[in-house]
Amino acid sequence: MRATSKFHYLNQFHPGVWVATALLALNAFVWNSVRDWRGWRIHWGWPAGGWVPVLVALGVGLVVQARDGRGDAIYRERGFYGIIKISEFSLEGDDFRLLLNGRITHGYQFTEAEASGRVTTYYGPPTGVGLAVQYFPLEENATGGLRVGVGGLGVGTLAGYAGKGDYYRMYEINPQVVNLSSLEVGTFTYLLQAKERGAKVEVVLGDARLSMEEELRADKPQGFHVLALDAFSSDAIPVHLLTKESVAIYLKHLDPKGVL
């Protein structure tokens, strides 16, 4: 079941507010050196113009705080990997729910039941990963369905392709994201719907490369038909996922005809 009733509202102060507070504290403890006919004299006081940067920083922080706190955010939580926020929007008659980490979108899902299983963003049917998952040529005598690995869970969008007998293994480093997209208590329901269609879905909490490396050490290659890597946020590229050594790890997890 969707845990929409379990949203919790956390008012997070924008960094600008904290900067302003720090400036106020700093000003309060600045010692001014004033020279007069008696020589140097030190006393407590506010330096000339000290209020100006304080008021500017405080004003900017409060304006941004007010903007970010508008009603579209139904969930907000700060964690080790930044602020996770869920917003709800309506566009051209469609309602959808959006997951953001800072200012980076990690996927969205339509909220209406009829459209909630629709694969969105850059995972759609005409995209590279969409084509690979939809048209991978399974052997006629294959005993199981499609095996798909995903580095970076997001809202679980790729599970929208999962059918009966398929196996989807998702690797995600951020426990907040796992909680919001998991089968048991997820706000986003791609994984739950995949399970209801008869697919098996497992979420591995941890760094994708390290987790796959541990699986190889345990002699558990996954035999993925498709392995998709999308563990990237803005310009902070996790280079360790793109090295020659990491690619060698991925290839060992692929079926002989698998697609990376």
Please provide the spans of the model-predicted regions.
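Alpha-helical transmembrane segments of multi-pass membrane proteins
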Residues: 1-260
